[in-house]
């Protein structure tokens, strides 16, 4: 999902990092 901890770049795009 969007907030998976192994993908900080995507987390930032989703506002989760």
From Swiss-Prot:
Cystine pairings recorded for this chain: 2-16, 3-14, 8-17
Protein's cellular compartments: Secreted
Residues the record lists as 4-hydroxyproline modifications: 5
Keyword Ligase annotated: no
Keywords: Disulfide bond, Hydroxylation, Secreted, Toxin
GO cellular component: extracellular region
Keyword Transferase tagged: no
One example GO MF annotation: toxin activity
Tissue/organ expression: Expressed by the venom duct.
Family to which the UniProt record says this protein belongs: Belongs to the conotoxin M superfamily.
Free-text comment about domains: The cysteine framework is III (CC-C-C-CC).
Protein name per the record: Conotoxin reg3j
Taxonomic source organism: Conus regius
Lineage, top ranks: Eukaryota, Metazoa, Spiralia, Lophotrochozoa, Mollusca
């Amino acid at each position: 999902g969007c907030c998976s901890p192994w993908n900080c770049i995507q987390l930032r795009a989703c506002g989760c990092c």
